[in-house]
């Protein structure tokens, strides 16, 4: 269902990034703008290098590794948010990504408005969102905050809203980055149970977490990534044990 072939992602640290018209304008006024910037090709690093693995339909794959290992970058590549420097990704199925809190939200809009905005981003019709609106609100536990701008939400509240919208229908492929570790314990457990329901229904899951207990509970196999390179792929308990020993080492 998901196949990664020799994925590499290179970041050039020697290039100034003028990502917006506003920043370019500021740079011109300050004299920092140079038309002919030279790339420092020797000043780069590989966030991912030579990553190969396959995920079958219905598998729940955990992605573990230290901070900066390249896990979030890999999720963005699989989701199509980022294009790899080298290699290719084949995905057969519709992806529902939960990789950044607030991605797909307009923080100035209310929770009510963002249900429709984020739902549209995920490909849901207005008719479906109308039908599922009360279900989303009930699951998110945010009924009293429907008309509050999301910019005033805590990270936990934002996570609740994002998860509740993304899971109103069972996606073919669910990509989750640490979202189950955000929010109160009650919601974490409720989210975990919801994921278990989707897994039983055949949803394919790629799941990043530093919580090895959660990885052990949910995942059928694990990919251990370190410094952008796959260290091990295999049985959940074996790979988690090896990773834990390396960290305690």
Describe the role of every protein-language-model region.
Residues 23-33, 116, 128-145:
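Conserved ABC ATPase "signature" region
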Residues 209-210:
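H-loop/switch region of ABC-family ATPase nucleotide-binding domains
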Residues 64-66:
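The feature captures the beta-strand-to-loop junction immediately N-terminal to the Walker
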Residues 233-234:
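ABC ATPase "signature
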Residues 3-46, 237-241, 245-248:
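Pre-NBD coupling/linker segments of ABC/ABC-like ATPases
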Residues 215-217:
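A short, surface-exposed alpha-helical micro-motif characterized by mixed small hydrophobic
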């Amino acid at each position: 269902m998901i196949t990664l072939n020799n994925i590499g992602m290179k970041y050039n640290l020697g290039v100034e990034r003028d990502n917006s018209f506003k920043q370019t304008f500021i740079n011109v006024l300050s004299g920092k703008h140079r038309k002919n910037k030279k790339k420092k090709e020797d000043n780069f690093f590989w966030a991912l290098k030579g990553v190969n693995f396959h995920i079958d339909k219905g598998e729940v794959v955990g992605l573990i590794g230290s901070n900066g290992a390249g896990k979030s970058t890999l999720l963005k590549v699989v989701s199509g948010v980022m294009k790899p420097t080298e290699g290719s990704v084949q995905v057969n199925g519709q992806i529902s990504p939960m990789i950044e809190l607030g991605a797909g939200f307009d923080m100035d809009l209310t929770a009510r408005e963002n249900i429709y905005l984020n739902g549209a981003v995920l490909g849901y019709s207005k008719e479906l969102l109308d039908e599922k609106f009360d279900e989303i609100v009930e699951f998110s536990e945010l009924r009293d905050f429907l008309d509050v701008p999301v910019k005033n939400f805590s990270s936990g509240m934002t996570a609740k809203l994002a998860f509740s919208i993304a899971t109103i229908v069972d996606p073919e492929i669910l990509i989750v980055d640490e979202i189950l570790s955000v929010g109160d314990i009650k919601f974490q457990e409720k989210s975990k149970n919801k994921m278990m329901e989707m897994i039983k229904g055949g949803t394919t899951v790629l799941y990043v977490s530093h919580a090895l207990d959660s990885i052990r509970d949910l995942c059928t196999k694990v990919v251990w990534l370190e410094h952008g390179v796959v260290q091990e792929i295999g049985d959940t308990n074996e790979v988690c044990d090896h990773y834990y020993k390396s960290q305690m080492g």
